[in-house]
Amino acid sequence: MAPISLSDIISALPSEDSWGPSTTSETTLNGVPYAPYSKGDKLGRMADWTAEGKDGRDGRGGRQQYNRNYRDQQVYGAGTSSLFAVQLAEDESTFSVVSNTRDSTKTRFGRGGLARGRGQRGGRGDTRGGRGQFQRVGGRGGQQGYNSYDTRGGRGGARGGRKFGWKDYDKPQRNRDASVNIKPDWKMLEEIDFNRLAKLNLDTDDGEDIDSYGFLYYYDRSFDKQPVKAAERKLNVVDRASYNVTTSSDPVIQELAEKDEATIFATDSILSMLMCSPRSVYPWDIVIVRQGNKVFLDKRDNATLDMVTVNENAADAPMDASEGSKDAINQPSALAEEATYINHNFANQVMKESDSQKVEMENENPFYNSAEETDPPASKAYKYRKFDLSLNDEDPVHLVVRTELDAVSKNAISGEDQFLTVKALNEFDSKAQGSGGALDWRTKLVSQRGAVVATEMKNNSCKLARWTVQSIIAKADVMKLGFVSRANPKLNDRHVVLGVIGWKPRDFASQMNLSLSNGWGIVRTIVDMCLKREEGKYVLVKDPNKPILRLYQVPAGSFEDDGEHDVIEENVEEDD
């Protein structure tokens, strides 16, 4: 081939000033260069070095995989690699959807459950103090008026429910009912989220005793021994008169209020719920009555506050079962009634009942009336204790709380009497939904006691925190925790005691990362909200589905249909 000279190359160059192919009228549209195309044409770049080759990353796949994964993506508008598509900052081509649809379906059920307990919880005293007539807790009667903790709709088609899909993890799956019906004439004053409550702090002293009532039996140490598998201890029904009277109906608190002993009055059950509120999940409510410069923390009759919850803090908490389902005994309301029944009978069973060996308090039981009660009183000591919640000396604020002790025991070393609180954890079915990954107590309680307790701390954080707070403010030396399981996981009317473990309350609180200073700060904050407002009645409500507390101002006659909270008002009218 003859060589080409430089002059020939220069002469072959186009003579126009512009570079590139010459523009003709056939390739222009209104004078603008235009290339006709259809949306079915394959469009791409001259050289795209960022795309994968036809052989794939690992050299395998071949032409068929190339056509399926690469070539067809270049169709106009077909994928993210189109020239006309918006290029995102992050590549989402590798995103995949994982279905979280569950096979089992749950539907809403009609409320029902275990028939336990002797009548209603709470009660009211005589209008002028004294013993009056009080309703008892525990026993065998029916418990009425209990609101279900979890009242979700159906899940998955059987009752009009819907299937779960993408991002359902981010949607509320359990819509619980509020513990009290919010009426239109209630005025919301404050809304506090739990994050704000967790930052509160108030240091206070250990408190001082004002007076004590009742008596205590000695604790039966044989329950501390590990039972033989062939001879497990059965949980027996022990009928004893026990009371859970609200604050304003307590004749002793009425007398202390008339003497201006304190600004705030409460019971240990109500106070512990308020102090441990950031750990709560289920709904609850506290009635707050401001009378003059005094604040009474009360509860309603049949309130969920008195029920012992089960696995409230578990990641997969117990759910409602369908009507007629075999899992109906494992729904939240039935488990709560079962746990309340177990705690009442367990505390009575572990006592050595002997009139010659018991510790008498300074005064008799203020709620027991031998002329009306057929059952003997339960081993119970009521200590009225006073705490200083003042921020400075110029503005003193004190709190009087009625605390409870369950038993007394001799110290193994010094031989001195130690005061005990007795509670019970219950196992329903380690394999059922809502068990929270709990271990089998029958096989693991002895060999892996630490793991069993750690799991209970996780699944029942609020319940254990409340028991610990009640033990500390009562100045109990030891908190006994019994481990009670069903004799048959499918039946909730027979139980066995698998063991009892004792802790010092403050040591147990440190293991749970429980701060009493935070609890006292919450109490002082809520009380200050009521003290800065006018006299009247307020209700503190835990939102059933959100970690929020709401303070409502309610009419003065609210809840009086239930026969409660009118004791103070009647006393004031008589004084006038």
UniProtKB/Swiss-Prot annotation:
Residues 304-318 are annotated as: RNA gate. GO terms for cellular component: cytosol; eukaryotic 43S preinitiation complex; eukaryotic 48S preinitiation complex; eukaryotic translation initiation factor 3 complex, eIF3e; eukaryotic translation initiation factor 3 complex, eIF3m. InterPro entries: eIF3d. It is found in: Cytoplasm. Keywords: Cytoplasm, Initiation factor, Protein biosynthesis, RNA-binding. Residues 103-176 are annotated as: Disordered. GO terms for biological process: cap-dependent translational initiation; formation of cytoplasmic translation initiation complex. GO terms for molecular function: mRNA cap binding; translation initiation factor activity. It comes from the Eukaryota. mRNA cap-binding component of the eukaryotic translation initiation factor 3 (eIF-3) complex, which is involved in protein synthesis of a specialized repertoire of mRNAs and, together with other initiation factors, stimulates binding of mRNA and methionyl-tRNAi to the 40S ribosome. The eIF-3 complex specifically targets and initiates translation of a subset of mRNAs involved in cell proliferation. In the eIF-3 complex, eif3d specifically recognizes and binds the 7-methylguanosine cap of a subset of mRNAs. Component of the eukaryotic translation initiation factor 3 (eIF-3) complex. Belongs to the eIF-3 subunit D family. This is Eukaryotic translation initiation factor 3 subunit D.
